[in-house]
Amino acid sequence: MRKRISAIIMTLFMVLASCSNQLEAEKLAAESKNTFFDSLVKIGQGFQDIFGIFGNAIGDALGFNAVKSDDKRSKVGEHFEGVGKGLKDTKIKLDELLKEVTAAPHADTTEVKSVINSASAVLTKLIDSVTKLAGAVGNTDIADGVSIANGAAAEEASVKTVIEGVKEIIDVATNSGVKIEKGNAGTAVANANGPKAIIHNAQAAAGDATKLADEVAKADPWAMIDKIKNAKTKNGIAAANDDAGQLATATNAANNNGTAATNADLAAAVALKAMAKGGKFTQPAANEDGAVKAAAASAVNKVLGILDVIIRKAVNLELGKIKEAVKGIKYSEATGEATESDTAQPITNKSSN
């Protein structure tokens, strides 16, 4: 009888011990899941902070109205510096997010870390490019030279740096998945319909500055940025069918020399001459200096505006890739490997590509 009672008591102890162990295991599992989901909340908040910082920074610096007709070229440099600061602040937040992801317990974050590192590399390249552009611009008036009869070529090294910076931004954005529009380049522009106002060796005739302003006003910004990306430079006088870089760096010539290959080339040349070091516009006819200044500011703003659009699209695409990767983070009770079906909740944002 005593043996039977002892067996029963032993069985009860074993059952109670088993129940206790099971309850403890369930408690630990629940705590692990709570810790996992708390980490996801922090990651989600950090992600939203990145969108906010980037949107505010680039939104404040949007370049379609970056310069006015009486501004110095240094204003262009300040714009690029502002964009660069926004990108740097975004990268800092991205690095902080990477730390949050790395520290997340009970989660397989390998893919997320890879995507964040890739996005960080894109930001670094964009920062380098806008820094290069900021250093390439001059510090004289946007429409420098309106009181001097002879136009002057923009510094070739400065123009080359601008071309390189623009090309780098476009290449980075293309690799991120941004569709770069070719735009409508328009047709060739005769010397008398605009080029004469920026390259010839004597004061422009009445109406020349207005014709230049009209050509710039109708230019497609996408086509302008494409022309800058593919531009060449020259050491010599302007010639027929010159591209944007050649017109900007051409030495002054007789009034009938130099035509633009397309409307977009002419407008892009105006932007390059107005941004780069050394470039001077030809003295306009009496009371037409305002038209040259307007053309210069408009051309620069079109280029800056499209560059900002391209940068914004590239960064938004990279952040979108992070968003999708974060949504796929899975819970793991033991090793951090994805062994359970619990996944992160979707992160919402208001950004667009």
Swiss-Prot record:
Covalently lipidated residues, kind S-diacylglycerol cysteine: C19
Membrane topology: Lipid-anchor
Pfam families with a match to the protein in the record: Lipoprotein_2 (PF00921)
Classification via SUPFAM superfamilies: Variable surface antigen VlsE
Keyword Signal attributed: yes
Signal peptide location: 1-18
Keyword field: Cell outer membrane, Lipoprotein, Membrane, Palmitate, Plasmid, Signal
GO annotation, cellular component aspect: cell outer membrane
Lipidation, N-palmitoyl cysteine type: C19
Family: Belongs to the variable large protein (Vlp) family. Beta subfamily.
More details: Genes for both Vlp and Vsp families are on (usually) unnamed linear plasmids in B.hermsii HS1.
Annotated protein name in UniProt: Variable large protein 12
Organism of origin: Borrelia hermsii
Name of the encoding gene: vlp12
